[in-house]
């Protein structure tokens, strides 16, 4: 990469970081202006268009980066798990670290998931589906259950994790610790329930129909 290309990438990075830095509990992406972001990044507003077509393209880039960042962290967590330790507790701790270190990235995913922009909603939905798919892959490999079961389990887990993350954004250390413990318990219950349901479905093939009540 030449010097000019490096400088362009550096400026593009500055714009993304500037936009993230202006998000908060009180301020959403929709309230940001091109001028504010450019000023924070240290460039003229007109220079913004050398890097992004408009503010929406910047926002979509931020959504992609937020989702990728979270998935990479969870992959690292699974690598740590391979060396020993609780799968669920290590994953929850890693997720809460992400919330603590990147609150605005998670805020963006939460808000745009149900925002007014169809493009943003679709982008967040894609990121969440990537997250679910990677978790389902892991569960299928580790638990030796059919894909339909691991996908259902992964979707339930991700839904609860995102809900807990929303609560964890603006609470103190002790409250976050309590949330973490509750989340570990909830995920273990889902995991046990998924395994029980799978075993129950397996047993149906060896039991005379009608002897087991549907729950």
From Swiss-Prot:
Keywords: Cytoplasm, DNA-binding, Fatty acid biosynthesis, Fatty acid metabolism, Lipid biosynthesis, Lipid metabolism, Repressor, Transcription, Transcription regulation. GO terms for cellular component: cytoplasm. The keyword rRNA-binding does not apply. GO terms for molecular function: DNA binding; DNA-binding transcription factor activity. It is found in: Cytoplasm. Homodimer. Residues 10-70 form the HTH tetR-type domain. This is HTH-type transcriptional repressor FabR. SUPFAM superfamilies: Homeodomain-like. Residues 33-52 bind DNA. Represses the transcription of fabB, involved in unsaturated fatty acid (UFA) biosynthesis. By controlling UFA production, FabR directly influences the physical properties of the membrane bilayer. It comes from Escherichia coli O1:K1 / APEC.
């Amino acid at each position: 990469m030449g010097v000019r290309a490096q400088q362009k990438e550096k400026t593009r990075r500055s714009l993304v970081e500037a936009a993230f830095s202006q998000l908060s509990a009180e301020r959403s992406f929709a309230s940001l202006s091109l001028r504010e972001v450019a000023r924070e990044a240290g460039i003229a507003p007109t220079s913004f268009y050398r890097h992004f077509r408009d503010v929406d393209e910047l926002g979509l880039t931020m959504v992609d980066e937020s989702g990728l960042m979270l998935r990479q962290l969870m992959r690292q967590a699974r690598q740590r798990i391979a060396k020993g330790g609780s799968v669920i507790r290590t994953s929850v701790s890693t997720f809460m670290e992400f919330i603590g270190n990147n609150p605005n990235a998670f805020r963006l995913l939460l808000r745009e998931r149900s925002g007014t922009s169809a493009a943003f909603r679709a982008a967040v939905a894609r990121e969440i589906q990537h997250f679910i798919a990677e978790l389902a892959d892991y569960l299928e490999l580790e638990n030796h259950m059919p894909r339909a079961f691991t996908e259902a389990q992964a979707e339930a887990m991700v839904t609860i994790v995102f809900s807990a993350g929303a609560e964890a954004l603006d609470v103190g250390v002790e409250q976050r610790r309590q949330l973490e413990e509750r989340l570990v318990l909830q995920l273990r219950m889902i995991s046990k329930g998924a395994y029980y349901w799978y075993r129950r479905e397996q047993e149906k093939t060896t039991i005379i129909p009608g002897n087991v009540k549907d729950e």
